[in-house]
A protein has these predicted regions:
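Short acidic, glycine/serine/threonine-rich loops at helix termini
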Residues: 130-133, 162-165, 197-202, 230-234, ...
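Short Gly/Pro-enriched turn/cap motifs at secondary-structure boundaries
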Residues: 194-197, 227-230, 242-244, 275-283
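A short core secondary-structure module
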Residues: 214-268
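Beta-sandwich/jelly-roll carbohydrate-recognition scaffolds of carbohydrate-active enzymes
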Residues: 175-179, 191-209, 224-226
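N-terminal glycine-rich flavin-associated loop
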Residues: 149-171, 196-199, 339
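Short, flexible loop/turn elements at secondary-structure junctions
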Residues: 124, 192-194, 210, 221, ...
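Flavin-dependent oxidoreductase catalytic core characteristic
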Residues: 2-155, 174, 178, 182, ...
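A short, Trp-centered hydrophobic/proline-enriched beta-strand micro-motif
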Residues: 182-190
Length: 673
């Protein structure tokens, strides 16, 4: 896998070099090498699901619904017991401190159930539960008004503990993992005041102090670590830093933060609140170090950026589970309000538009759950998560924002009450769009990841010709005004000789004919698929066993994803080297891939659920189809039928997504009792 990834990286890197962007090419090469190392560590030896759906061979439908199987099979009883005991603490007023932070009493309660060591091996004091169970726990805490708990613990067990499990020495594991399992907080400090989350540009650095057998950590001023969750006095922290002030090598170091700020003596240290509105119930800090001692043995060996990639795949999957839980908490509050509020012609919940918004929230929760558990199921079976881990996060966080807006439409001004649950959740809903990577940038990365193999194997010849055309006799890049970004009529008119040479080189390159042959074979294959597409899904051996209401959506999404291959080829032929800068069309392709993947994953997941859950899936799938194709009468009618079915289930309290949830009393109730 490592060798393959390194080869594949050359196409993207060489394209950037040919386009004259040498600095970005170097950064991309380093990042791809780090991703390659992470994949090798994970032994991800199976091609990613998203890539196979676009370029083939297609996965089985059993693989597409494997997330639902994992969710159904995991042990939930002990997790539910812990969550409900924690909820009781919240109702008793013991969950938060006077300044509305998670209390030590609540942490102790959760630790007594093993929550802080849920996925850690038993030899280090953990429960050795699966990451699918961590996703379930995160969703349950979030659904029951304790999203801050899921944020704290997910940070502990994904980014924090994963670095030690994947790259730490046995001595480091024995030292730190039992502390984490017992409830000691651990932060992962990457983000900086000056460079944000750009791992290749971190300015924090360490220098050797051989006399004292330690590193000296420096993070002053713009190098301060910022927005660091769980960074508290006395907590553990994994610090991303350069190994030398001007070094290109990035390292990772475990430290125990002092119990208080230190302003005098051998070193200086401070830990202050980040002053953010999101995650207000969590600890989130700005941390400064000057000449701070870090024992040599506390360095986690390995490329710090590689370790980050290794950990982030889990963080994005668990974030989706948190989105699912938060949307479920929204749904139970909105339904409680709509059942009591008088509207025109009766209770609000009688009307189609409020019910549609309720379906939007519930289907968003279902979608986020499906994405989370499929991603984790794929990860546990050695499938490369390229593409899927990214769209899992971006799609789930955007659905969360849509659900927030839907809740506000139904409940109106009461969602703005200072004590309302939605008021506390609102900044979190927006923050999830930028934490773990900003959504649009994630989508751009997703497109690159899932097309890398195809680019290397089929388009490398064209890129090589353009690179050669943009190199002078001495092997140096030509001036910007003489660069050929793409071969077209305009280029021939302005640079006819060089363009002719480039075209001759292209048709003389055997990879050009590999591309032509590939396109011909793909066209022939797609022609056959077009004929198959005329056969109704219910008569298809692939789709016939699925619930009838979902067959069309699985078929539609699979065909749409195959068409994305042609979309990508078209972008390359149109923009050529300019595609290294053409972010808008690449983002549009990324959004289309994301939407089609969501339709496919949601329909596949719901195919193994009850009828009401399937109705919610139909509601959301119909909406996503109309987002791609425009408003359609038949899809609108399917939505309305789904709303009716969900409404009947709500009357009977038969919506499984709401099981055991308790609504929060809404503000300014009109019934004194």
């Amino acid at each position: 896998v490592s060798e393959t990834k390194q080869t594949l990286s050359s196409s993207a890197v060489e394209a950037l070099k040919a386009a004259g962007d040498v600095a970005q090419a170097e950064d991309v090469a380093d990042l791809e090498a780090a991703q390659s190392g992470s994949d090798a560590k994970l032994k991800s030896n199976k091609a990613s699901l998203t890539e196979r759906l676009i370029f083939g061979p297609p996965p089985s439908l059993d693989e597409l619904s494997s997330g639902a199987d994992y969710y159904a099979s995991i042990g939930k009883a002990k997790i539910d017991e812990m969550v409900y005991a924690s909820r009781d603490e919240m109702f008793a007023g013991n969950a938060f401190t006077a300044d509305n932070k998670l209390s030590d009493e609540l942490r102790a309660k959760i630790a007594s159930y093993g929550g802080y060591g849920l996925t850690l091996p038993k030899e280090y004091g953990g429960l050795a539960y699966s990451y699918n169970q961590l996703a379930y726990m995160s969703e349950q805490f979030s659904a029951n008004g304790l999203s801050s708990v899921s944020i704290e613990i997910s940070g502990q067990l994904t980014i924090g503990a994963s670095a030690l499990l994947g790259y730490g020495t046995e001595q480091q594991r024995q030292t730190f993992l039992p502390l984490i399992a017992s409830g000691d907080l651990i932060a992962f400090a990457l983000t900086e005041v000056g460079v944000g989350v750009n791992a290749k540009r971190v300015q924090t650095y360490v220098e050797e102090d051989k006399e004292n057998n330690c590193w000296r950590l420096h993070a002053e001023g713009a190098r301060n670590k910022l927005y660091i969750t769980n960074a508290a006095h006395g907590a553990l922290a994994a610090i991303v830093a350069r190994k030398g002030k001007t070094s290109k090598e990035i390292g990772l170091f475990i430290v125990r933060l002092p119990d208080q700020d230190v302003s005098e003596g051998d070193y200086q240290f401070s830990c202050k609140p980040s002053n953010v509105s999101a995650f207000s119930q969590n600890i989130n800090s700005r941390v400064s170090f000057s000449h701070f001692p870090v024992p040599f043995e506390n360095e986690i060996k390995g490329n710090g950026v590689e370790v980050l990639f290794y950990c982030l795949r889990l963080g994005r999957c668990i974030l989706a589970a948190q989105c699912a839980g938060i949307q479920r908490s929204m749904a139970v509050d909105v339904i409680n309000y709509a059942r009591q509020r008088e509207g025109v012609g009766g209770k609000v919940i009688k009307h189609e538009l409020p019910l549609s918004n309720i379906c939007k929230i519930l289907s968003g929760a279902l979608m986020s759950r499906a994405l989370s558990h499929l991603s984790l199921a794929q990860d546990s079976t050695g499938v490369n998560l390229a593409g899927l881990r990214d769209l899992t996060k971006s799609a789930s966080s955007e659905m969360l924002q849509e659900s927030l807006y839907a809740a506000e439409k139904v409940m109106g001004g009461r969602t703005l009450d200072l004590d309302a649950r939605l008021t506390q959740l609102r900044p979190i809903c927006h923050a999830f769009g930028i934490v773990e990577g900003e959504n649009d940038l994630i989508r751009l990365g997703m497109v690159k990841d899932v097309t890398t193999n195809f680019t290397n194997e089929r388009l490398a010849g064209l890129l090589a010709v353009l690179q050669q055309a943009n190199t002078d006799a001495d092997g140096k890049p030509v001036a910007a005004d003489k660069r050929i970004d793409k071969l077209n009529l305009n280029t021939f008119l302005h640079m006819p000789v060089r363009s002719m040479k480039a075209c001759y080189s292209l048709v003389s390159n055997e990879k050009f004919y590999h591309l032509v042959g590939s396109l011909v074979r793909s066209a022939a294959s797609d022609t056959g698929e077009l004929v198959k597409g005329l056969v109704p899904a219910s008569f298809s051996s692939r789709y016939g066993h699925l619930p009838k209401s979902l067959q069309h959506y699985v078929k539609y999404a699979e065909r749409g994803l195959r068409h994305c291959r042609w979309h990508y080829i078209g972008l390359n032929l149109k923009y050529q080297l300019e595609l290294t800068r053409a972010q808008v069309p690449m983002l549009q392709l990324g959004k289309r891939i994301e939407t089609l993947m969501c339709i496919l994953i949601l329909a596949s997941h719901a195919s193994k659920q009850d009828k009401v859950t399937q109705a919610l899936a139909v509601y959301r799938c119909a909406e996503m189809v109309m987002n791609l194709d425009g408003v359609c009468g038949s899809q609108t009618q399917k939505q309305r039928k789904a709303i009716e079915e969900v409404a009947r289930a709500l009357q009977k309290d038969e919506v499984s997504l709401l099981d055991q949830l308790i609504p929060e009393p809404f503000a300014h109730q009109w019934d004194e009792q």
